[in-house]
Regions:
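Conserved phosphate-binding elements of NTP-dependent enzyme cores
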Residues: 1-954
């Protein structure tokens, strides 16, 4: 009998309360509930962890040491479990060498395609490259300067690992005595020992001769022999001058430029044979930036204008010598110098042997950087450096020879620079002849199919060349989802974490179709999700709760979406059915007459926009993925204001000007990055609560009697902490072929402090007791301490009363980290002139959590502050005072203002996808109780801002 259920019995991981759960196999099942209710504990830390652990245990001990191994979850049993694959939100890769193309493996297929049917062209003149004969190579050599000494060499080994003893012995047997190994001339009869773990290049010297009349016959024989030995390649090296690689296979008839036989590695920017020699395949160089090195262009260079190097007597003396040699006035502000003098000071004299031999300020600093052994000095200079586009490959990462190979008239870099939607069209348009079809038909099919999967999950605006480090968590997750769909596995359990993050409502349907496709292949798809449309389209829903933290971890309801909506105890069901809803403003705020304007925004795909952000209101920036929201708000607005207000060195995206910055005194970006990267960081330390708590304990009579200071109650320094575990509460035991085991410290019992410190109590609680408690409980204990109560209350207000005060920062999801940052800002004194920028703050939030978040944002705004939010959540969009909708599409088809105004005004714009979604909500067709509020009164109707328009400059 076939197993139809995944049965979980007695799940107790984290806050789960010994629950039993049945999950139908081969279904799309959604786990939902409040933040902190135990969703991830059930989906990832219990079900996925056990599935992965069982699979890894089937492998050999040798194989297990290379894999991340999961701890056995706290559960009685799980039956009917399939091999599990987790697709989480974590960023795909931080490596600058990883791109969308490499992580989806589409780039590997492109390398195969271009190496098999690509047409080489001359990188110099653009003509098709043809083969060169031995006679043509002889003519080239004879055209060199008379009496030039040349070596004719044959490449035997090119960039391969090994010792190559047999190859060199064979060369000696054939009468060859010299070769060049890794750039060094060696005698083949010597006992050479090459490191077999490193790449080597071996070129045997076939002949050495002087260019003069009468050597043609000997030269032709030598070239022919070299061709035979080198597989058609001949290297002609003019002693102490340039070297030229000739090929009997591929060479330009006019320029004489030869390229080696095309291989997949010729198109790899991670291989020395394909990578641009200047930037080594990165497409950019991290170098000293003149705009940063000259800290004030309005001042003379030696009087406040120059930053690094200004205190160096050697550099100052060199600059003074340049002044004497070229005759200009050093008292002139740097910006007043003509370009010629600026370039002279920055880059030095254009040729060696100039009047002064000056390297330039940048050259001097580079020289110091290379010679310095001081990490402090290196870190100091990093502040004056920027990533600039490589001047040789212009960001395309590959050698000129590789970039000159074309398929369908496009180079591989041209193809990877296209948005995926257009790359898909280009792949479909490739016409193959009979022979090409045999060679590359399957390759083109794979490329096309994988591009279709990426397009289907809403990533058509990305390019294959997009750096993986710049992808959001949601984009990275959808890329992995597309890769899994492409693998066409069956009988697998897929566990996903909020795949709808970052997706506009327009694209949500395609994502759900992709998940259903994965299910229809014969897989079980388990999704942690809060999105209403996803819950409605699920086959089965598991609702956890009823609260968060210790008040959660119970199975509230399970069944079909209809059964969840009819459940009287399900908070999720109450929101979806309309019994409960998120209230909307009855009247929208009017702007205070002030505004910040971004003029001429042209970064990335923005189309020279003029954008006005009214102050004193909540503005939501909307638009489909890739429409330019993050570029406008994070890359331009935030960086430009941070530069003006805080002298930030981070350069803003391209724009003409920012006006109105004088109307605010602070700009604060509240994102989802971790509040700390070590287990010692926690909400108490981040919000400043811990310092006040330590002061409180230091003031207690027991502490005064013993002479304890606040430092005694820190687990980060010696004195009061447990020295056995260094204040961590646990110790790590290495287990070789098993995962490392963390065991509770046997000295302090996991409490982090020594016995003397723990004996100090406030109202019967030690400081370790408080750190182990939920924030809401600590608030009750410390409610009479004003400076602590206010900060604890803000954590409760943003819906984080369930987290432990001392919970490790590394265990906090992005959504919780963002709300902790929001709570810290709420706890500060408000000036009413602060601009808050938030990027998708509803990530990881249940309907009820969104309600609490909106209450907090309204509080901030009512104090006179301004809030700008990038968001797709319709409840947040409906509660905005002002909407800026970008689009209409993503990538090159985006970057324009589609609509702007109040939600009611945007809802009337027919070409706005956001407007369509708002109209459905206002009309109640979304079947969400929150839509029943209808439109709010237009408090902005009398404002000075136009309701809609493109915002583009003429």
């Amino acid at each position: 009998m076939a197993i139809t259920q995944i049965s979980v019995r007695g799940a107790r991981q984290h806050n789960l309360k010994n629950i039993d759960v049945e999950i139908p196999r081969n279904t799309l099942t959604v786990i939902t509930g409040l933040s902190g209710s135990g969703k991830s504990s059930l989906a990832f830390d219990t079900i996925y962890a056990e599935g992965q652990r069982r699979y890894v245990e089937t492998l050999s001990a040798y194989a297990r040491q290379f894999l991340d191994q999961m701890e056995r979850p706290d559960v009685d049993s799980i039956d009917g479990l399939s091999p599990a694959i987790s697709i989480e939100q974590k960023t795909t890769s931080r490596s600058p060498r990883s791109t969308v193309g490499t992580i989806t493996e589409i780039y590997d297929y492109l390398r195969l395609l271009y190496s098999s049917i690509g047409v080489p062209h001359c990188p110099n003149c653009g003509k098709r490259i043809a083969r060169q004969s031995a006679e043509q190579i002889v003519q080239r050599v004879m055209s060199l300067t008379p009496d030039d000494r040349v070596m004719i060499m044959a490449p035997i080994v090119r960039g391969r690992k090994g010792e190559f003893k047999k190859e060199m012995e064979k060369l000696v047997q054939h009468g060859f005595s010299r070769a060049r190994v890794d750039g060094e001339l060696v005698n083949l009869e010597d006992d050479l020992a090459l490191d077999k773990r490193k790449n080597h290049t071996i070129e045997v010297v076939v002949d050495r001769l002087l260019v003069k009349p009468g050597i043609e016959h000997r030269l032709e024989l030598s070239v022919g022999l070299a061709m035979k030995l080198g597989g058609g390649l001949v290297l002609v090296a003019v002693v102490n001058e340039e070297e030229t690689l000739y090929s009997s296979r591929l060479a330009c008839p006019d320029c004489g430029i030869s390229v080696p036989q095309l291989e997949p590695r010729s198109f790899s920017f991670n291989s020395s044979y394909g990578a641009c020699p200047e930037c080594h395949g990165l497409g950019s160089r991290y170098d000293l930036d003149p705009a940063k090195v000259i800290v004030d262009w309005s001042k003379p260079i030696l009087d406040g204008g120059l930053g690094p190097g200004s205190s160096s007597q050697n550099l100052v003396r060199s600059i003074q010598l340049v002044v004497q040699a070229y005759g200009f006035n050093l008292a002139t502000p740097f910006e007043k110098f003509p370009d010629k003098i600026q370039n002279l000071l920055l880059y030095g004299e254009p040729q060696r042997g100039g009047k002064s031999g000056f390297l330039g300020i940048l050259g001097y600093l580079r020289q110091n950087l290379e010679a310095s052994t001081s990490d402090t000095y290196r870190e100091y200079l990093l502040d004056f450096m920027s990533a600039t586009e490589c001047s040789v490959c212009h960001g395309k990462r590959l050698r000129p020879e590789s970039l000159a190979v074309r398929v369908n008239g496009m180079s591989i870099a041209d193809f990877t620079s296209l948005p995926i939607a257009r790359a898909l069209e280009a792949a479909r348009s490739i016409q193959l002849t009979g022979r090409e079809l045999t060679i590359a038909g399957r390759i083109v099919h794979e490329i096309t199919e994988r591009l279709e999967f990426l397009h289907d999950v809403g990533l058509g605006y990305l390019s294959l060349g997009r750096s993986a480090a710049t992808l959001s968590g949601g984009e990275g997750q959808r890329i992995r989802l597309a890769t899994q769909i492409g693998s066409k596995l069956r009988g697998v359990l897929y566990v996903l974490d909020e795949p709808s993050i970052g997706l506009h409502h327009r694209d949500n349907g395609r994502l759900l179709a992709a998940l259903e496709n994965l299910r229809d292949l014969g897989n079980t798809v388990l999704v942690v999700e809060h999105d209403e449309e996803t819950i409605r389209r699920a086959d089965y829903v598991i609702d956890l709760g009823p609260g968060a933290g210790r008040h959660g971890g119970e199975l509230v309801a399970s069944g079909t979406p209809a059964e969840i909506m009819n459940s009287p105890v399900s908070l999720t069901g109450a929101y979806i059915s309309g019994r409960q809803h998120i209230a909307m403003l009855t009247e929208r705020r009017s702007p205070n007459g002030k505004a910040i304007a971004v003029l001429g925004a042209r970064a990335n795909n923005l189309k020279n926009l003029d954008v006005v952000f009214p102050l004193g209101v909540i503005t939501v920036v909307t638009g489909v993925s890739g429409s330019g929201k993050s570029t406008l708000v994070n890359d331009i607005l935030y960086r430009a204001l941070a530069k003006q207000l805080y002298r930030s060195r981070e350069e803003p995206g391209t724009h003409k000007a920012i006006t109105g910055a004088e109307m605010i005194d602070k700009v604060i970006r509240i994102d989802q990055s971790p509040i700390g990267r070590t287990p010692r960081s926690n909400p108490a330390t981040y919000t400043g609560i811990f310092a006040a708590v330590r002061d409180l304990y230091a003031m207690l009579p027991e502490s005064r009697e013993r002479g304890y200071k606040p430092g005694r109650f820190s687990f980060n320094v010696s004195g009061g902490r447990c020295e056995a575990c260094q204040g961590e509460g646990q110790r790590r035991i290495e287990m070789n072929f098993l995962p490392d085991v963390y065991v509770q410290c046997e000295v302090c019992g996991g409490r982090r402090y020594n016995h003397e410190t723990l004996s100090v109590h406030y109202n019967g609680y030690s400081i370790a007791d408080l750190l182990e408690m939920p924030v809401s409980d600590v608030l009750q204990i410390l409610e009479n301490i004003p400076q602590v109560k206010q900060k604890l209350q803000t954590l409760v207000d943003v819906g984080l009363g369930y987290i432990h005060l001392g919970q490790s920062a590394v265990t906090l999801p992005g959504g919780e980290a963002q709300r902790i940052k929001l709570a810290r800002e709420l706890g500060k004194r408000q000036t009413g002139k602060t601009l808050y920028l938030l990027d998708e703050p509803t990530t990881g939030l249940h309907f009820d959590d969104v309600r609490k978040l909106l209450d907090v944002l309204h509080r901030l705004t009512d104090l006179g502050n301004t809030v700008i939010i990038i968001e797709h959540n319709l409840d947040v969009i409906r509660n905005a005072d002002w909407i800026l909708d970008l689009g209409p599409e993503g990538g090159e088809e985006g970057g324009r203002i589609v609509a702007q105004g109040t939600p009611e005004q945007v809802a009337r714009v027919k070409k706005s996808y956001t407007g369509h979604a708002l109209t459905a909500y206002f009309n109640g067709s979304a079947k969400n109780g929150s839509a029943k509020n209808g439109p709010a009164k237009n408090g902005l109707a009398n404002g000075a801002l136009a309701p809609t328009g493109t915002g583009e400059r003429a």
